[in-house]
Amino acid sequence: MAGAKEIRSKIASVQNTQKITKAMEMVAASKMRKSQERMAASRPYADTMRKVIGHLANGNLEYKHPYLEERDVKRVGYLVVSTDRGLCGGLNINLFKKLLAEMKAWSDKGVQCDLAMIGSKGVSFFNSVGGNVVAQVTGMGDNPSLSELIGPVKVMLQAYDEGRLDKLYVVSNKFINTMSQVPTITQLLPLPASEDADLKRKSWDYLYEPDPKALLDTLLRRYVESQVYQGVVENLASEQAARMVAMKAATDNGGSLIKELQLVYNKARQASITQELTEIVSGAAAV
């Protein structure tokens, strides 16, 4: 019965692992609901800011802010939003693959890339592949605040203001639903013109009080901060959804493995009993 004992030990081990993955699935489901609420609360502000900026980009402005002007591209920057923890399926690696493909396209044109990382998984990955990480923030937890993001955002905006960057993007996972999270790369600077057909057919003249430069400086920075924050909360909701799905799959796979091991155990036990009976019958026949 040595084989049967070993199989029993494997079954017990899988059952213990299954309990852990089931608990993690339930925790992720609870955190996902909270993350979705936070995402839904911030999304209207981010969307409205995007519309306002779309108006500005299409407007006839008396003061042309540097964030509105296209430049010859020699260096681009990416604010990359990843997770601090693993066990969330292919969420991070799918995002990294998309970014690496875009970085290669820039590299083929002779354009260099700077990276500001939000999340420890992105930091470790891009350090390992030789990415130029110029800023990072990790360990923000399940309730990130805008103040925690100011560091990387400030570094990239300062580089853009000084002409060391010619384009700036935010890279994150967009939450569609529990089963679908899409890696996205969104241009922040220079401000992209709105894709709204109505806006393209019209133009606006703006009057600024008191000073257009001061107003636009504040508004455009708020816009960048709001889009990065929205990317973070969307990525957090995506993380919890992906983890819940991954842990459910692990729990289900554990159940299937237990059934297979139980079948192997029953066969081994049956073979052992058959062998013992054969030995008894053979011994009786010999007598």
Curated annotation (Swiss-Prot):
GO biological process, one term: proton motive force-driven plasma membrane ATP synthesis
Gene Ontology cellular component list: plasma membrane; proton-transporting ATP synthase complex
Record membrane topology: Peripheral membrane protein
Disulphide linkage map: none
Top-level taxon in the UniProt lineage: Bacteria
Localisation: Cell inner membrane
Annotated SUPFAM superfamilies: ATP synthase (F1-ATPase), gamma subunit
Pfam families named among the record's database cross-references: ATP-synt
Predominant cellular place of this UniProt entry's protein: membrane
Keywords, comma-separated and alphabetical: ATP synthesis, Cell inner membrane, Cell membrane, CF(1), Hydrogen ion transport, Ion transport, Membrane, Transport
Single annotated GO MF: proton-transporting ATP synthase activity, rotational mechanism
Role, per record: Produces ATP from ADP in the presence of a proton gradient across the membrane. The gamma chain is believed to be important in regulating ATPase activity and the flow of protons through the CF(0) complex.
Family: Belongs to the ATPase gamma chain family.
Quaternary structure (record): F-type ATPases have 2 components, CF(1) - the catalytic core - and CF(0) - the membrane proton channel. CF(1) has five subunits: alpha(3), beta(3), gamma(1), delta(1), epsilon(1). CF(0) has three main subunits: a, b and c.
Protein name: ATP synthase gamma chain
Organism, scientific name: Klebsiella pneumoniae subsp. pneumoniae (strain ATCC 700721 / MGH 78578)
